[in-house]
Amino acid sequence: MSTVKRILLINGPNLNLLGLREPGHYGHHTLAQLVADLTVKATNLSVTLDHIQSNAEHELIDAIHQAHGNVDFIIINPAAFTHTSVAIRDALLGVAIPFIEVHLSNVHAREPFRHHSYLSDKAVGVICGLGPDGYEFALNAAVRRLQSES
């Protein structure tokens, strides 16, 4: 009997403002809608999806640390921490859980400071610019990867 795989969805700073903040870049979906839709899809794919959103870097790092031994895959939208956080990078490397980096907007079509990611070279993959669909694509890719490892 196989165990149900667990995926942790991490959303970084200001993503709690989805639906309000710069809808031209981020769309009109709220974070609650995005997580609810993804949770249904995860259930249909027979995996468990846990979620955290925080504007505090240390809370995201703590969640990554707590994922060790409890989570099989991470989907992370580090938001602004993408471009600044060596600490989140080190946490992900420390727990050695595979992860996909997701961004709602195309970070490469935006300000130059958004072009660099401290995570992308260590990610299984990076999805950007596809809005909420990017999360679904990441979920499907994570599940396929976990199934291929079983």
Curated annotation (Swiss-Prot):
It comes from the Bacteria. GO terms for biological process: amino acid biosynthetic process; aromatic amino acid family biosynthetic process; chorismate biosynthetic process; quinate catabolic process. It holds the Pfam family DHquinase_II. Gene3D superfamilies: Dehydroquinase, class II. SUPFAM superfamilies: Type II 3-dehydroquinate dehydratase. Pathway: Metabolic intermediate biosynthesis; chorismate biosynthesis; chorismate from D-erythrose 4-phosphate and phosphoenolpyruvate: step 3/7. The keyword Cell wall biogenesis/degradation does not apply. InterPro entries: DHquinase_II (IPR001874), DHquinase_II_CS (IPR018509), DHquinase_II_sf (IPR036441). GO terms for molecular function: 3-dehydroquinate dehydratase activity. It catalyses: 3-dehydroquinate = 3-dehydroshikimate + H2O. The record marks R21 as: Transition state stabilizer. Its EC number is 4.2.1.10. The active site is at Y26 (proton acceptor), H103 (proton donor). Substrate binds at N77, H83, D90, L104, S105, R114. Keywords: Amino-acid biosynthesis, Aromatic amino acid biosynthesis, Lyase. The keyword Amino-acid biosynthesis applies. Homododecamer. PANTHER family: CATABOLIC 3-DEHYDROQUINASE. Belongs to the type-II 3-dehydroquinase family. Catalyzes a trans-dehydration via an enolate intermediate. This is 3-dehydroquinate dehydratase. It comes from Photobacterium profundum (strain SS9). The lineage of its organism: Bacteria, Pseudomonadati, Pseudomonadota, Gammaproteobacteria, Vibrionales.
